[in-house]
Amino acid sequence: MQGSVSSLEIIILAAGQGRRMASAKPKVLHTLAGRPLLTHVLDTAMALAPRAIHVVYGHGGERVPAAFPEASADWVLQAEQRGTGDAVRCALPRLADDALTLVLLGDVPLITPGTLKTLCARAADGIALLTFEAHYENQYGRIVRDDQGRVERIVEWRDADAAQRALREVNSGVLAAPAAHLRRWIPRLSATNAQGELYLTDIIALAVADGVPVATASPGDPTEVWGVNSRADLAVLERAFQERQAAMLMAVGVQLMDPRRLDVRGQLIAGRDVQIDVNCVFEGRVELADDVRVGAHCVIRDSRIARGARIEAHTVIDGADVGPDCVVGPFARLRPGTVLGGHARRDDRVQR
């Protein structure tokens, strides 16, 4: 059945240059929590178990797909960046006729599977938009509704008049619609607008004209739909991501001496009654068993720390296995391949 989970195909738009990043690197390759922005979006897409993932790339050329050699994705080149509508047009031939198509943005890394499942459920045989209320200055496209509250169209900021810019409901850029509808609407898009581009958002007015229902959904947390357009944006999202990690750790019994001073740049698996002091960095896959204590200013990378171990302040552990009830540090360094048996002690005089 059209719109069922089994028919889901995802398009990720990742072709943009990101001029405000002031970088030679494609925007989606900039890192959040130690991983490229696009990696976060790919992981979320995979969590939905789609039939296919199509990534539209352009700026930076083959550097983008080359950075993800293990990704289960269909890479689609947008040779000339002519807008989001053109990006989806490039991917249209790859979609199955019965596909429910979910369009994601490669520079919006904090979107969650739960929010996207809700959005897809509301698409049915129509179209569903992810919108949110923005009570701060921004340049998102505005959602225009009629007197009965039905969505009429989306007006991009540069094309909006003063009254439209005053609207608070804005477009996140994420939407879901059957591929059959997209094939009908995309060829009808026009570049007659302030940016001279094909706006994907213009399909909303076409849907309304065709009598196709337009539904909306909202994220549980506004940070889910915040995008990265500058280094400042990236810094804000980095903190939002780390706050989310801190909340999840505390929910499973970890004591953080200051949740605002924690950096998880990979996967941190922690048992109960773990205590982590301030300014610690965890990279790659790190496992902390029950009752582990980690002192301030430690860096732990791709390591396992067994039950009851104590890692004192200013210690660096890289690719090591630390046994139960060990004491490491302060100011110690364990190099890759180090294995410490139970109750061992290593201080600042030892670098393994």
Residue positions per predicted region:
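N-terminal nucleotide-binding beta1-loop-alpha1 segment
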Residues: 1-23
